[in-house]
Structures are given as structure tokens and as C-alpha cells.
Design a protein with these regions (language model features):
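Short, acidic, small-residue-rich periplasmic hinge/interaction motif at the N-terminus
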Residues: 1-38, 47, 72-74
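Structural signature of outer-membrane beta-barrel domains
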Residues: 17-19, 72, 84, 129, ...
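Outer-envelope beta-barrel architecture signal
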Residues: 73-75, 101, 134-138, 158-162, ...
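Short acidic/polar hinge/loop motifs at secondary-structure boundaries
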Residues: 36-38, 82-109
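N-terminal periplasmic accessory domains that precede
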Residues: 1-2, 46-49, 65, 92-98, ...
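Extracytoplasmic beta-strand/coil segments of soluble accessory domains associated
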Residues: 38-86, 103
């Protein structure tokens, strides 16, 4: 006799191996390492640090860089995914990126995905910090040519955070006595030479793998006599 039996459910599961594809043209530069590089007048400059990487050429005294024979305009520079078309202050002496507000720096020198279109040489991705989600923290720095401040903290603890960071140079204040001393007796010359940057970001964690953020940047150069 043939009898049938009902058995419990049998589940067969398999897991695919995660293959990590190494992209040889991608270089990630730790921001803490960038801060240890000697800088002009003590002003940490991310673009100047990029110019020191292998496969990258630069011109003396400018913040532009050349990759694979292309000009500076063939480098796509992104700040939190948004293109930055003018990445320098005062004619290229300093870059517009405040290192105190930056979380990560990645340079892709070739073979970058199609979503980074419109450029031939490289893609420079700069991501801002997300802010401290546990406690408030503030920093204030006085340098040779500029002062900087950073304020970050939670809006909703462990959920929503913010960061505000800014800097302003005071080259005009330092140089004013020397300019007036060199001017014609009986006349005064007002030197206007400074720039400022302001970065702000609000980050909200939706889940462990998802988040939404709003980031903003503004800056200005002022030059006049």
C-alpha cells in the first residue's frame, strides 16, 4: 500500500557573497590628515591637499588642479552632491571649503559613473559633517588671516542634528596701517580685502539606513581700494 504523509514546511535559503569592487581610481583622503599638511598662513586648504595626490598636477599659486591632461573646468566638484562652479577665493589663493565643516573628501580620477556627467577629468566629492546628535559642541579658532567658528548639536537627540560653521578673513584690518603709511601724505586709502564662508546643515535620521538632510553654503569675496 502507498501512504502519503504531510510534513512541515522546508525552507531553503542561500546568501550571495558580497563582492567588494575595488575602484583603483578612487582616493579617499581623511580630513584629519588634510589638517596636518602645512598650509599657507596656517589656513587649511582641501584643494591644495588634493594637488599633492599622485596623478594630479597644479599651477603655482592657484586652487585649480589638472587630472589626466584636462583643465580645471573638467573637474566636477560636488559639495553634498551639489556642483560648485567657483571653488576659490581671492583669485585662487584659498579654496571655498572650510575644513572644520567637512566630513569626507573623495577624488575619482577616471572611470566614474555616468551620473557624474559633463566632465572629462575627475570628480571631487566633499561631504559636510552631519552635526553632533548627542550633545552641543562649539569651537572658535583665531588664525593669522582668519577666524572660524563651529557650532553643532542635537535638535532631537539621536534623531535630528545641526551644524553651523563660518570663517572670515581680516586681511583688510591687518594691511590697513601699511597701506595708509604708503599712501600720499594728506590722503587716506581704505583697503577692502576679505572673504567669508558660511556652511549650515540639518540632518534627520529616518531609520538606520535612511536619512534626509538640508545643507546650505554662502560665501563672498570683497576687493576694493
Amino acid at each position: 500500500d502507498i501512504e502519503s504523509f504531510t510534513v512541515g514546511e522546508i525552507q531553503v535559503r542561500g546568501e550571495a557573497n558580497i563582492i567588494n569592487k575595488t575602484q583603483t581610481s578612487l582616493i579617499e583622503v581623511p580630513i584629519e590628515q588634510i589638517k596636518t599638511i602645512p598650509a599657507l598662513l596656517g589656513e587649511v586648504d582641501i584643494i591644495k591637499a588634493i594637488q599633492l595626490l599622485p596623478g594630479v598636477q597644479s599651477s603655482e599659486g592657484t586652487s585649480g588642479f589638472y587630472v589626466r591632461g584636462g583643465g580645471p573646468d573638467q573637474n566636477l566638484i560636488l559639495l553634498d552632491g551639489v556642483p560648485v562652479y567657483n571653488a576659490s577665493h581671492i583669485g585662487g589663493i584659498f579654496s571655498v571649503f572650510n575644513a572644520d565643516a567637512v566630513k569626507s573628501v573623495r577624488l575619482t580620477k577616471g572611470g566614474f559613473p555616468a551620473r557624474f556627467g559633463g566632465r572629462l577629468s575627475s570628480v571631487l566629492q566633499i561631504d559636510m559633517k552631519e552635526g553632533n546628535s548627542k550633545q552641543f559642541k562649539g569651537d572658535f579658532t583665531v588664525g593669522l588671516v582668519s577666524s572660524k567658528f563651529t557650532l553643532e548639536g542635537p535638535i532631537i537627540k539621536d534623531k535630528t542634528s545641526f551644524i553651523i560653521s563660518g570663517r572670515r578673513t581680516y586681511i583688510d584690518l591687518i594691511a590697513a596701517p601699511f597701506v595708509n603709511a604708503a599712501s600720499t601724505p594728506g590722503s587716506s586709502t581704505d583697503l577692502i580685502l576679505y572673504f567669508y564662508d558660511l556652511n549650515a546643515k540639518i540632518n534627520h535620521k529616518i531609520s538606520k539606513k535612511n536619512r534626509i538632510f538640508f545643507s546650505a553654503y554662502t560665501g563672498k569675496d570683497k576687493l576694493g581700494i
